[in-house]
């Protein structure tokens, strides 16, 4: 059975790559694209160009290195067309279990040294959990409870970069690229997905995006519902209260139109609102089976109107849900969300969709750990996006395989073997005196002496649930 699964997977992989190849144009790009995708699926520690050249063409590594460098860094094929083809092939596999439930917006960071890689700046890096030198990309994933797939991906170009003509020129940032905030990039992703007719889902975002009122209102204007993380100081009107109407007209000038507040009529922060809720408002809800037990926490929900600058508006905003999480044992609530899901949505459904955002975290984890999303070593705009696009293509195949391989199959399934690297191979920059290649370039090198004899071939484990 294992051998049959492996053979079938290899056959499907060949057909999958053939479809991706069909949208890249020139025939001279076919070989490099195949090899790059294969390299991303190989069991190398590093998925940058040099080690992938060594494992995909061990007898002509130097020539392969140059070929892959040109293909990933300079070739003008369309990232959007490749991602569209991947989406076309993979989404039907994901939807075999259930329709798409969510559109998940988030960003991911890549720690970097120096200042010359495109978009690198001192900014918050989620991978490190702190401010540091890094690149950040904003993505959109389509998800259901079984799987998810990134369908849009773009580097965030900090304002200092967008205004620096010299650095833009050196890294070949396209002329049309201007500074945009991360929420603005996210909105572009969402608009493009709507225009492409992608299967609709609830837009999910954390507080880094959800606190942006314009983003939330723009998502609603596109006909999408959302669940958006917010901060504890977000101000709202509790159901049954709202801003004061405009002042009575005095009979002179234009009649007043703007809503009002006064000293005794003010909105409340969601944190204060949560602390004042009665005990019966809180409910323990389970939302997903974890590795050892069901995940659960304590939640409350209330209907509110967002108060953000409504004194500059002529009408109150519509009511929406405020969802609050306050785990047992915590001194105060830990998370808050606003949601435009229908008023009759069940409590459990609201929590379930809110927590589905974990899917994009799974995407990022596996894109980085399994197919080398963060391993690109070039400095240019095009190479950064080409590498990410093919990482998503490789990941898309692995996602579709999860939906194809029967549940009774072993936890790991292998189908690609890395060829042995010639003993004469030396990575660029190594000294003639040092006759040992760097460990990360030799996919078969045992890193410690007690691991036993070196194997002739190494098989790549498939991703697993």
What are these regions (language model features)?
Residues 398-428:
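Conserved nucleotidyltransferase catalytic core and NTase-mimicking acidic/glycine-rich helix/loop elements
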């Amino acid at each position: 059975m294992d051998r049959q699964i492996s053979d079938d997977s290899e056959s499907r992989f060949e057909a999958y790559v053939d479809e991706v190849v069909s949208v890249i144009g020139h025939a001279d790009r076919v070989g490099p694209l195949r090899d790059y995708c294969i390299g991303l699926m190989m069991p190398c520690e590093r998925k940058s160009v040099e080690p992938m050249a060594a494992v995909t063409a061990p007898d002509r590594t130097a020539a392969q290195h140059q070929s892959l460098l040109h293909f990933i860094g300079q070739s003008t094929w369309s990232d959007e067309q490749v991602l569209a083809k991947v989406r076309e092939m993979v989404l039907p596999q994901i939807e075999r279990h259930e329709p798409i439930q969510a559109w998940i917006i988030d960003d991911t960071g890549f720690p970097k040294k120096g200042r010359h890689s495109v978009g690198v700046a001192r900014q918050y890096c989620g991978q490190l959990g702190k401010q540091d030198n890094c690149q950040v990309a904003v993505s959109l994933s389509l998800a259901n409870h079984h799987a998810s797939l990134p369908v849009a991906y773009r580097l965030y170009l900090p304002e200092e970069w967008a205004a620096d003509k010299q650095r833009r020129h050196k890294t070949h940032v396209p002329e049309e690229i201007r500074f945009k905030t991360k929420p603005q990039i996210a909105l572009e992703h969402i608009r493009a997905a709507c225009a492409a007719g992608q299967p609709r889902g609830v837009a999910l975002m954390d507080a880094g995006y959800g606190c942006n009122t314009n983003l939330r209102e723009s998502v609603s204007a596109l006909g999408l519902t959302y669940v958006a993380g917010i901060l504890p100081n977000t101000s709202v009107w509790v159901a049954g209260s709202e801003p004061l109407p405009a002042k009575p007209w005095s009979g002179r000038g234009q009649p007043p139109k703007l809503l009002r507040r006064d000293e005794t009529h003010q909105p409340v922060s969601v944190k204060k609102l949560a602390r004042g809720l009665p005990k019966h408002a809180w409910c323990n809800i389970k939302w997903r089976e974890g590795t050892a037990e069901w995940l659960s926490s304590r939640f409350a929900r209330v209907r509110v109107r967002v108060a953000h600058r409504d004194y500059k508006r002529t009408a109150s905003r519509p009511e929406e849900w405020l969802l609050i999480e306050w785990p047992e044992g915590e001194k105060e609530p830990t998370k808050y969300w606003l949601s435009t899901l229908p008023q009759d949505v069940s409590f459990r459904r609201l929590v379930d969709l809110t927590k589905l955002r974990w899917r994009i975290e799974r995407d990022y984890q596996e894109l980085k750990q399994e197919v080398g999303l963060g391993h690109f070593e070039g400095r240019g705009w095009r190479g950064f996006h080409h590498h990410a696009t093919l990482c998503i293509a490789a990941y898309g195949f692995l996602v579709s395989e999860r939906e194809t391989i029967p549940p009774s199959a072993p936890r790991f399934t292998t189908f690609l073997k890395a060829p042995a690297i010639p003993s004469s191979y030396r990575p660029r920059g190594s000294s003639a005196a040092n006759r040992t290649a760097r460990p990360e370039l030799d996919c078969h090198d045992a890193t410690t002496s007690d691991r036993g004899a070196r194997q002739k071939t190494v098989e790549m484990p498939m991703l697993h649930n």
